[in-house]
């Protein structure tokens, strides 16, 4: 196989196309993490790439998303910067290398999937004012080194490049940019570069919380090994709530009043309440992903979808929906 040209070696294996979610966080605080968790539940990305996490070793343990394994690279010595790659815990992933200096933050991982070509993913942050030449040299050198070590691997390079001139780097490594829209105001700072021809262009999602960078979604072919379970829940909506309130107000509670003992009254109370609930908020068996956070409710997901629809249609209502989404998240977390 050593005599087979590199391009032919890559074609000999089926490419692995994970679904990838990316955003520049500008501080991965709790509110942004919660909305990111909602996005993860809706879009089910296999990989989440984050730039400008603004974390350190002490804070990373509190920044976990259920069902994902974390790979962090923190900026040393000062606030800001930092990158992370989160991979679904059903994926075989190995961290290859990372680099953090005063000018760049970068982390590289390799994903192995049976019968597919290995996939190397890099998440990089090139801050404003950093040396373009230094970053380009780092990218070129690291990509070449990893390509030589893993000759059948394919690449996804994503991050905030802050207008870094990447034309020569892309041409040398046969990389195509899949981001065709502005990612922060009127600038395209965040990119997804790949040599996998089967990918379609990235999709634009609304920013998380009060962020000013949009999210990028790269739709792929996810593994079919996600674990689901059936759970029993009461179906509650605004209509059923009103009916429930009315039923409670009109209930005579005769069974409770007629009971002769304390235990009898408690039992009658429970039976009456159970009957009212079964009438107006019946139980249903529903399928959900195992270990799904209980605070990510159907209403939270519905509002998040509406926010993204408004954002992509350039409707001004998305800001109001974004504020509503934040209020719902906080309320749901308190319950």
Identify the function of each model-found stretch.
Residues 28, 89, 114, 128, ...:
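Generic structural motif
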